[in-house]
Every structure is written in C-alpha cells, then in structure tokens.
Amino acid sequence: MSALFSPIKLRGLELPNRIMVAPMCQYSSVNGEANDWHFTHINTLALSGAAMFCIEATHVEAIGRITPGCLGLYDDATEAALKPILVSVRKHSKTAVAIQLAHAGRKASSHKPWDGGQQIPVSQGGWQAEGPSAVPHKEGEAPPLALDAPGLARVRDAFVNAARRAERLGIDAIELHSAHGYLLHQFLSPISNKRTDQYGGSLQNRMRYPLEVFDAVRAAFPAEKPVGIKVSATDWVEGGWDLAQTIEYAKELKKRGVDWIDASSGGVSPLQKIPLGPGYQVPFAQAIKEATGVTTMAVGLITEAKQAEDIVVSGKADMVALARAMLYDPRWGWHAAAELGGQVEAPPQYWRSQPSTQKALFGTTTFGTR
C-alpha cells in the first residue's frame, strides 16, 4: 500500500491521503474580494486528488495585504465573496478546505510580482505598512510603522475575527502564516525585530507575539477543527532566524496544541542565499518532527510521485504540500495514485477518464447503458 495514499487524522479531520495543495497567492482580488479567477482556480485544484486544499494567504486586514490584488477575509464583503466558491467546492468535491490567514507586515503595499514586486509608495497609491520595528525590508524603502500596544491588539483581534469568519464559511482547517518574511515571521527574526520591550530581544520575547496570535486563533476556532502553522525554518542569512530557534518555536506551539507545522524557509531578507534543489526543505520538516513529534508537512520543489512517497515512507515528514507542481499538473494527485497504486476520489463526470488498466483508481465506479 502506498504511504502517500494512506489516511491521516488532524485533530477531528480525517484525510484519505497525505497530500495538500499548498496556499499560493494569486494576486487577483479587487478590494480583497475573491472573484471568477478564484472560483476557477480553487474549484480546479479541489479536484486534484489531494486530500486538502489550502486557500492562498488570506489577509486579516486591508493594510496587511502584500499587494492590492491580495485576498482578504476582514469584512462582510470579503467573506461573502468566498461563500459561493466554497458552496461549489462542497457540491463537487470531498477535498477538505483549509485557509491560510496572514498579515504582510512590512512587506505590505507591494506591486504584484509580474509588475516588479517593489514597494508602492503612499504617493503612488500605496499605504503605510506596519511591522514589529521601523526597519524596512529593503534598503531605500520607506520603513514600516512599529506596532504599539493598541496596534498589536488590533492585529491579533483581526486574526481572531478572520478565524470566526472562516468558521462561518465552513472552512475545515486554518494555517497561520508565520513564514516568508511576513508579519509573524518578522517578530521571530532578529533581522526584522529590533524591539526593546517584551516582544523583542531574547528568543522567548520574539516568539511571544506569534504565540499570542496562535493562542487567540486556536481559542476562536472550533476545538474539533485543526489549526496548523507555516514556518520559515531559516532566514538563510547569518545572524537571522535558524533551525535551532525554529525547533524551540515548534516546542512552544506543541504545548499550545498545534496540529501541523508546514516547514518552509526564507523571505525575511533580500540578502538570503537559498540552495535550491529537489526537496531542499525536507530536512527542516524532518528535524522538527524528530525534535517535537508534531505532525509536519514537507514543502518546496516536491514534484514527483516517487519523491513524495519516499518522504512519507522514510518518516521525514507526515505529509507533503505541493504548489507549482499542482499548477503545472492540476491532476497531480490522480497521476501519483496511478503510479503508486493508490486511490483517489473523483466526480462521476470524470470516471471514464481512468486508465483501462487501473479500473480501481477512482474506487467503485459503475455505469448503466441502454
């Protein structure tokens, strides 16, 4: 039996395989609202064969968006825009739906990547970003405003309100974004956090605010539903956040009931030097799992079925999260199951597509004729 296509349970959520479609920013919203692009994108990948699809980084405040095109869940309009998409997914797919809740912090007010990705000045239609400290992401950029006590409370409450909206929408799980140089990661990293109060300096202090946000979201979301987190295991910059600190963070998250840790890396500094290669971040998931016993997801240049199978079989991670590989092959899960001898759920409209040599790929399928 394929390990990749064996079941796993995250709190009260039972998944038939170990594959998640990773959250991928689409930069295609207007005023934070999902639209026809998201309808097509989400419904397509909900039929990928993955056990869980995670909606892209969904921002808890308008000023917390990376770009003007980023998705939000911070008011009635953004909540209402997601609802018909989720109704459609539920109608046609059994895939669990998670949502990644995020705040860009000092990396907010940026152009879309295909428009250059640089900071948008306030004078050109951008907005004032906020962060742990008044330290810009890049030299020459306008610095963020350092969040004061009321600001910290406001952002924490925005995460809570987004979690409650996610529950109203029937979302199955939440992933908190504390990676890739966004707000929660900015608090963790000594590169971006220069505070001298209880939220800066020592490792315990730098972890304090992200852990407070996790606690608040966990308390706001139903107890039977899982809450995971995405981390950057290293900044890839000397003197920055690293794997040893990540493991301490993971231990604190375990005490608080985290249901999975999605182990990525980088994003907090343009000085990063990342040694890209197939599965280059898998050792981070493995180290976190071995040190804490927390369920981990491996992510990053996982593209082949055998590669994903080996990651799970070897115990390096409990699950795999795929992003660009899913965009390139939106039926990646089907093809992986066919290669590994697994089984996936598919809508009856597509049953006839299974290979003639693999009539069990979609389970029991029968057709009447006359």
Please annotate each region the language model reported.
Residues M1-R370:
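Flavin-dependent oxidoreductase catalytic cores
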